[in-house]
Structure formats: structure tokens, C-alpha cells
UniProtKB/Swiss-Prot annotation:
This is NAD(P)H-quinone oxidoreductase subunit I, chloroplastic. [4Fe-4S] cluster 2 binds at residues 74, 104, 107, 110. The keyword NAD applies. HAMAP family: NDH1_NuoI. [4Fe-4S] cluster 1 binds at residues 64, 67, 70, 114. NDH shuttles electrons from NAD(P)H:plastoquinone, via FMN and iron-sulfur (Fe-S) centers, to quinones in the photosynthetic chain and possibly in a chloroplast respiratory chain. The immediate electron acceptor for the enzyme in this species is believed to be plastoquinone. Couples the redox reaction to proton translocation, and thus conserves the redox energy in a proton gradient. The lineage of its organism: Eukaryota, Viridiplantae, Streptophyta, Embryophyta, Tracheophyta. Residues 55-84, 95-124 form the 4Fe-4S ferredoxin-type domain. It comes from Capsella bursa-pastoris.
């Protein structure tokens, strides 16, 4: 008789514990009902990136002095810098500069250590392609500035969404 009573007591304790856990989960669910959704419809809505976002690298050919600091600080020796020594003026002349974004880890060391600030990070992050060789950008492709998300009229940004117009600013 005694084992049967202790079995019923254990069953009752386990039932109360399960009800408490279900109640805790339900309270968390109820606390989330007043929050606005964070999800965006990606191709049609885009988040505005932060100032420190590390996207595609922008390169200014005229500022580069071919010092190769970017290659030395890169953890994977990624930037390819081709130059020629001009003997009459004793300076390097940059011939070609390229970065393969299929390999780049976007650490930002090249931008940080560049002495002439010819490299900068942009807010562009869409690199989708069917051929990985198209991710190898030369100095011409690196020199193009991306279209800003704010200026893109085809995309409804978070700033124009109805939630932010009502005075609620969920993400910024």
C-alpha cells in the first residue's frame, strides 16, 4: 500500500511541475504578443546597414601607391597587386589590382592599414552569382560605388515601413 501512495505522490508532483513549465512557456508567448515583427521580406525590403558594416571593398586606383600593405596584413594574402618600377621617377606604378570575394573573409584589415585610404568598405553584400570566377573583381569593378539602399527606389526600406511611421522604431 505504501509504494502505491508514494507513486501517486510522485505522479502528482510531476503533474504540477509539468503544468508550471507549460505556464511559464505560455507567459513568454503572451509577453511576445505586443512586440512588432522583426522579420523583413528580403528581396523587397532591406535593412539599413550600420556604419561599421563590412561589405564589398571599394578601391580608388588613383590613390594607390602599390605599397602592398594590404597584402601583408591580409590573413589569406588575398589582394593581387601588380606593379612596375618606374626607374626614371623611382616609384612604383600600379598596373593591376584585384580581390577575389569568393575567398575574402571581410576582416577589414586591408582597409584599416592602408596608408593612403584608397580602400574602403561599402554597404553592398549581395554577391550572388552562378560562376565563382565572377567574384574576382579587378580595379574597374572595385572602383564602382554601389547604389545605396536608401536611394534605391525599387526597395521599400525599413524607414518607410508603416511600423516606423507610427512612432515605433523596432530595429534602429
Amino acid at each position: 500500500m505504501l509504494p502505491m501512495i508514494t507513486g501517486f505522490m510522485n505522479y502528482g508532483q510531476q503533474t504540477l511541475r509539468a503544468a508550471r513549465y507549460i505556464g511559464q512557456g505560455f507567459m513568454i508567448t503572451l509577453s511576445h504578443t505586443n512586440r512588432l515583427p522583426v522579420t523583413i521580406q528580403y528581396p523587397y525590403e532591406k535593412l539599413i546597414t550600420s556604419e561599421r558594416f563590412r561589405g564589398r571593398i571599394h578601391f580608388e586606383f588613383d590613390k594607390c601607391i602599390a605599397c602592398e600593405v594590404c597584402v601583408r596584413v591580409c590573413p589569406i594574402d588575398l589582394p593581387v597587386v601588380d606593379w612596375k618600377l618606374e626607374t626614371n621617377i623611382r616609384k612604383k606604378r600600379l598596373l593591376n589590382y584585384s580581390i577575389d570575394f569568393g575567398i575574402c573573409i571581410f576582416c577589414g584589415n586591408c582597409v584599416e592599414y592602408c596608408p593612403t585610404n584608397c580602400l574602403s568598405m561599402t554597404e553592398e553584400y549581395e554577391f550572388s552569382t552562378y560562376d565563382r570566377h565572377e567574384l574576382n573583381y579587378n580595379q574597374i569593378a572595385l572602383g564602382r560605388l554601389p547604389m545605396s539602399v536608401i536611394d534605391d527606389y525599387t526597395v521599400r526600406t525599413i524607414l518607410n515601413s508603416p511600423q516606423t511611421k507610427n512612432g515605433v522604431n523596432p530595429l534602429i
